[in-house]
Amino acid sequence: MTSENILAVDIGSNTIKCLLGRANPDGSVERIYEETKNSRVSSMESAGLVPNAAELAAACISQFQSAARNFSKNFKTYAVATSAFRLAQNGQSTADDIFNICGTKVRILGENDEARLSYLGAMSDPSIDSTEPTVYFDLGGGSLEVVFGSGGEMDKCLSLPVGAVNVTRRFINNPQKALTVAELSFLDNFFDMVMENAFGASVPSFKTLVGAGGAVVAARFAKKALGLGGGENVISFDQMHILLDAVCFCDSDVRESKYAVSKGRTDIVPAAFACIYALMRKLGAPSLTHTFCNLRYGLVLEAGKM
């Protein structure tokens, strides 16, 4: 395995993120530099990408590369895009435009590749026992990826088109305001239906539910803001219910000031928390463990084998 430094860029629906890292021989990732840009390329007005998606993504990539040079003079950039580009009619042409602007090729990941790389990254977290049966999920703006695996290998994956941006756009009338009881009830029923259709009557047995993505980070910070107990990176099922009610029945300003939700996520966090809560309920998971190791870590590991 090479020790070459890799700048992994993940163009998501709601944010664009990077990791400058190096794959270690033991399967872990040495993190050198990370950054997140709140650049939403997925439109809140209609399905698809915002008109300036290529310019937003190209600017972020260039800024990431410039910052990475402060840490490493030699690195290779690998950029990927997920469901926002995968589902957009102009996804490939937008990826081509990004290359024409900044010179970095963007690979649009299929559902299986996104799930596989995300799971690979999560299992590189030394705090997670990858030998045990594990369910991993990553909730983004465009989709929910759920992976069942054991022994560090993916066994089964599901990609559900219920990302927080998509669901908010479709079902919440004014996402900056507090939800009505009817809106929350609708979200609850909608996600129950989605989970039932996805998993059916039986769910494979597992030991640990592991979650990644901005929505889980937001839940972790909100849990801390409320002073809820337990491990710092562990959220119980009951705590997730408390967090869901907390962010739904207040406006976006309170979500930011009282519950530590980042400004770029205050409009979509009710849908995100409702999705996580419904997933935990369907799986029968008493808790979830958050990991910062994710798709970008998997991308560094994959690139390190090339």
Give the ranges of each region predicted by the language model.
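A generic, well-ordered mixed alpha/beta core segment in the N-terminal half of proteins
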Residues: V135-S143, V147
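Short beta-strand scaffold segments in enzyme catalytic cores
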Residues: I16-L20, L144-F148, G298-L299
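N-terminal glycine-rich anion-binding loops that anchor highly charged ligand groups
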Residues: G27-N38, S72
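N-terminal basic/disordered segments at the start of proteins
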Residues: T2-E30
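Short glycine-aspartate micro-motif
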Residues: I6-D10, T134-D138, L209
